Every structure is written in structure tokens, then in C-alpha cells.
């Protein structure tokens, strides 16, 4: 869980920036977006297969160059 200790001389903006960076590293925002709406398991499988196909095509294109 991200947490920031704020020093007396530190501004609020700097503390907020540090906190956002820690949240991004922890993957909290992406997790929240993923859980925002229920996704059926069949849809998850379909998205996973599409992503795998895209990765394979990208890898194949890279090997051709």
C-alpha cells in the first residue's frame, strides 16, 4: 500500500506527486479500471486471445525486419 511521509518543508504538490508515482508503480489505477465493471469470463478469454495474437504478429513483424 503506497504511503508518503511529508516533511514540514515539503509542499503538498510534491507529496501528491510522490503518492501518485507510488500508486502507478503499485498498479493500483490499472487494477481499479479493470475492476470498474464486471467482465464475463468468456470476454476475458477473448481479450486474452486477441492480445496474444497481437503480440505474435508484432513479434513476427519484428523478425521480418
Curated annotation (Swiss-Prot):
The domain of life is Bacteria
Q: Which InterPro entries match?
A: Ribosomal_bS21, Ribosomal_bS21_sf
**Gene Ontology BP annotations:** translation
Stored Gene3D superfamilies: Ribosomal protein S8
List, in alphabetical order, the Gene Ontology terms for molecular function in this entry: structural constituent of ribosome
Q: For this UniProt record, give its keywords in alphabetical order, as a comma-separated list.
A: Ribonucleoprotein, Ribosomal protein
For this record, the Gene Ontology CC terms, alphabetical, are: ribonucleoprotein complex; ribosome
Describe the family membership recorded for this protein in Swiss-Prot or TrEMBL.
Belongs to the bacterial ribosomal protein bS21 family.
The protein in question is named Small ribosomal subunit protein bS21B
Q: Tell me what organism the protein belongs to.
A: Geobacter sulfurreducens (strain ATCC 51573 / DSM 12127 / PCA)
Upper classification of the organism:
Bacteria, Pseudomonadati, Thermodesulfobacteriota, Desulfuromonadia, Geobacterales
Amino acid at each position: 500500500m503506497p504511503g508518503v511521509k511529508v516533511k514540514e518543508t515539503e509542499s503538498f504538490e510534491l507529496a501528491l506527486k510522490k503518492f501518485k508515482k507510488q500508486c502507478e508503480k503499485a498498479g493500483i489505477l490499472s487494477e481499479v479500471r479493470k475492476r470498474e465493471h464486471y467482465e464475463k469470463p468468456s470476454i476475458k478469454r477473448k481479450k486474452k486471445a486477441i492480445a496474444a495474437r497481437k503480440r505474435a504478429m508484432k513479434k513476427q513483424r519484428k523478425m521480418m525486419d
